[in-house]
Structure formats: structure tokens, C-alpha cells
């Protein structure tokens, strides 16, 4: 957030935060974990930050009441919010649902079955909402996503996120361990793999497309502009591209490249981009034509 922002950011993954995101931008991403009693819980981290043994801090080893007592909302709490679901059903909004695999302390080693159970529960929960097609995406970093889809038989659009990162530990360690996976997979290779698996979208880190890291992959690099962008268009064809993070200074460039942004920057007090242009937060659900863009950018 800008240092002078007066906006109070809601708790990540809370119903309040997701309602705000649904109203302010084109949709939201949320994280789900599975409790011991089979409830889908809106929580990101592999362990709760408490001074307790790991097996007492792991969400997958707790029941939903124990997790809720820590201030965590259930997925059902979100679906009970008409403010959220009405926008999902009628305002061209999308919801990306990231399914989390458990910390090793849980001793849940069959990630494909664990994810398949979550997928089935998600699809069953959404059955009566009558959502528009392609308004929901399920995904995760686990390489078992495709196997889980096969096991569950769900029909929701799905994909695997890249690079594959270990599901536990500190962020820096995760990135370090994930480096070989990042280096060995080019954008072209990722697109071919996802297409082969019947996945409509490639979800990837920005480093694949921007910065010096894009040069360390095998083959010719792609980028957000110039010849690299033309190369990206050629290899992606009609595949959707979901990319994170989305820095403010790159928002317009990424949108012009046809990329779906996954951004944490949903502060309603941010009205302009670093280049001085107006920031329009709903380019997909309420797109502006060129006349409106010019009018907004020329306004005082």
C-alpha cells in the first residue's frame, strides 16, 4: 500500500477481504485447506504462527471448530455472503481457488487423493449457485493437480501453477528449492504441458516473462513487449495466461499483453499508475473503450 494510504487492509482470505476484492476488481483468488472433519477453510499458511509444536499448528490436523476459533472463515461462510455470490453470478467476475497441500507433519502423503477430495467438495458447494461458465478456476502448485482432477472427475477449469514450490517452510527457502524447477521449464514447455493435460490456462510467476531470470530458460526468451511478446503470442495461441505478482508499474503493459493479473494491490485509494495514467481496476468486467481511457487520463 502507498505510505500515505488511509485504507485499512482486511485480514487475508477473510470474508471481508474477499467481498472487497470482488467489488473493487475483476475477481479474487482465495486459498483453501481441508480440516480433519472435512470442512474447507479459508487459510493460506501451512502452519499457524504460535509457540507450539508443529503438529499442534497444522490446519490439516485440526477440526473446523479449532481452526475457526483462530479467526479463520469457512468456505461456506463466504458462500453464505450474498454480497459476494451475487457479484460472482451476475457481474462477469471470476474466482480463482488455490488448493493447498498439507505440511509433512500431517503425515498426509497422498496429495492427489487429498486434493481430489477438496476438488469434489468445492464443486459440490458451488452446484446450486448456477455460476456462469469459466467464472471459476481451481489450481495449485502441486504436480498432483492433474491426477487429482482425474481422480475426482470434477469439470471445473483447472491448472497447475509454476514454478513448483515446496508447500512448507519460509518463502526464501521455498524459492531456493524451487529454482531447479524454474530453470528447467520454459514458457513454451509449460504451455505444451498444460495443453496436453487439457488445462485452459497457464499460471506462472512474472519472472518467466520479465527480468533477467527469463533468460536462464532453454530456448528463446519471451517478454511483455517487443519481439519477446510476439514470441509469447505465437507459443500461447489461445491459452490463458495468469501471472503474479503484478507491480503497478507493469499493470498496463501486462494488460496490453492479454495477461490476467494476480495482484495484491487492491487498495481503493490508489487512483493512478506510476506513469500518471488513471488506474482502472476492472478492465475485464467493466472494460473502457479508447474514448473513455483518453477522457480519464486527461482529467485533472
Predicted regions and their residues:
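Phosphate-group recognition and catalysis centered on beta-loop-alpha active-site segments
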Residues: 1-300
